Every structure is written in structure tokens, then in C-alpha cells.
């Protein structure tokens, strides 16, 4: 949520892994832009502890993420209801105004409805900011925000690395997705976008397979998963024969 105009973006994940924190933050930056500061709770995926002078000791992967994307983080002060409330008020607002009395088919449907709800909320008048959040954001906030850089480092956060099992599957969000047997690498990168899951080579130069995200716990096989590579035949006539 933008502290100045109240524009909001929410996204749900099936677990609270740090890689999903990074994916959700990148999607929020794509939606609203990158601010100078991000206010966050004192989560272990963000900060380990504070030193003797009270300065935060960042979790190393989060610190690298900050440097890559280009923003600084401010932490909620312990036992300080004003800053703590700034983070938790949105959670309460979402629970009471979005999640209440709704039925969702799966996480994909949940996020589609969440995005529609955010667009609707950002486009109506809110008394707290005395205006329409989207209009205030475009007029006053956008000039202070940066666009998300289109770099291999950022794409790497959107496509986490996964090890390929001996039977040709990668595990992502509690389910297994097939990788073509012809791929020689031991790892692959995985990205879920909407209702489709994409599997790329480790260098992200090749798309290996796509899967429909059904949220079923059954293994998802890709087309021709166990087919061997096609045999190459000579183009010129064969003149030499071997007799056994």
C-alpha cells in the first residue's frame, strides 16, 4: 500500500517462503512503481536482528534483493503501535472487505479476484485520503517512483531455481511438474503466471515446458516428457555395410 495515496496491491501465495515474498514485492513494484523506502514488519526473511547501536542486520538474500531492485527498507519499531498499525491495517481491511463472504476455486481464482478488487478500490473515493487513490498516485506519487528494471537479475527472482528429480520433475508450490527428458541440465527455473506454469533452462534462454496450473496434487507431465531425442540419419546414400 502507498502510504501517501492509499493505493493498494495484494497477492496470495500457498506458502510464506522468502522467494514468494520477493515475487510479490516485484509484482507490487510493477503495479505501483519502486519507492525510495519500503516499510515492513520485523520478519526473519527480512531482518535477523539489530546490532548494539540498534541498526538492523539484514538477512543476506533480502539485502541482495534490495540492492538489485534499488530501494531501502524501514522496519516497524518494536512495541510501537503507529508504525505497526500502518502495516497491519491493510491486512484487517482485506480480511473484512475482500475475503469475507467470498468463495474461491483455487489460488489462481483468489488472485484474479484480488486484482479486480484492488483496481476497484483504487478507483473510488476514500475519505482517509480525501480523494481517489489512483488519481492521487498518478498526479503526486508517480514522479517520485522508479520503473522496475528489466534485467536478468530481476527475472531470476521471478523464476526460482529448482533441482530436477531423477524421474524428470521439478517441485514447485507443493506439486510436481514434468521436464522433457531431452534436457540435459540438473536444474531448471520455474515461473507461475496466472493459470500457466513455465519451466525454463537454468540460463533462461530456452522454454522447456508449460503446464496448466490446476492445483491438483497429481504429477503434471509435459508433452513428450520421456521421448528420447530423434535419431539423426545420413543425407547421402550409405555405401558401406557391416556384416556381423
Spell out what each predicted region is.
Residues 34-54:
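Acidic/histidine-rich, metal-coordinating catalytic segments
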Residues 10-37, 214-221:
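Active-site beta-loop-alpha junctions of metal-dependent nucleic acid enzymes
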Residues 194-244:
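Protein C-terminal end segments and domain termini
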Residues 55-73:
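Two-metal-ion acidic nuclease core segments, chiefly of the RNase H-like superfamily
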Residues 1-6, 13-14, 39, 65, ...:
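Short conserved beta-strand segments at catalytic cores or DNA/RNA-binding microdomains
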Residues 91-191:
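Active-site-proximal acidic segments at structured loop/helix or strand boundaries
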Residues 8-15, 48-53:
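The substrate-binding groove and active-site-proximal loops of carbohydrate-active enzymes
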Residues 40-41, 52-53, 73-95, 110:
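RNase H-like two-metal-ion nuclease catalytic core shared by retroviral integrases
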Amino acid at each position: 500500500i502507498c502510504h501517501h495515496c492509499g493505493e493498494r496491491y495484494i497477492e496470495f501465495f500457498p506458502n510464506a517462503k522468502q522467494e514468494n515474498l520477493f515475487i510479490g514485492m516485484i509484482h507490487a513494484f510493477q503495479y505501483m512503481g519502486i519507492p525510495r523506502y519500503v516499510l515492513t514488519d520485523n520478519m526473519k526473511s527480512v531482518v535477523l536482528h539489530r546490532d548494539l547501536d540498534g541498526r538492523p542486520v539484514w538477512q543476506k538474500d533480502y539485502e541482495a534483493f534490495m540492492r538489485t531492485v534499488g530501494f531501502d527498507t524501514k522496519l516497524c519499531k518494536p512495541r510501537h503501535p503507529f508504525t505497526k498499525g500502518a502495516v497491519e491495517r491493510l491486512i484487517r481491511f482485506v480480511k473484512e472487505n475482500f475475503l469475507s463472504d467470498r468463495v474461491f476455486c483455487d489460488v489462481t481464482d483468489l488472485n484474479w479476484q484480488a486484482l479486480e478488487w484492488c483496481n476497484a478500490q483504487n478507483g473510488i473515493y476514500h475519505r482517509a485520503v480525501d480523494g481517489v487513490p489512483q488519481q492521487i498516485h498518478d498526479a503526486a506519487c508517480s514522479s517520485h517512483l522508479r520503473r522496475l528494471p528489466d534485467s536478468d537479475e530481476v527475472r531470476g527472482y521471478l523464476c526460482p531455481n529448482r533441482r530436477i528429480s531423477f524421474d524428470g520433475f521439478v517441485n514447485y508450490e507443493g506439486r510436481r511438474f514434468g521436464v522433457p527428458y531431452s534436457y540435459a541440465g540438473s536444474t531448471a527455473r520455474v515461473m507461475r503466471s496466472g493459470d500457466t506454469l513455465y519451466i525454463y533452462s537454468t540460463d533462461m534462454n530456452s522454454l522447456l515446458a508449460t503446464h496448466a496450473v490446476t492445483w491438483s496434487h497429481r504429477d503434471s507431465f509435459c508433452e513428450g516428457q520421456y521421448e528420447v531425442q530423434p535419431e539423426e540419419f545420413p543425407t547421402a546414400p550409405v555405401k558401406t555395410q557391416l556384416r556381423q
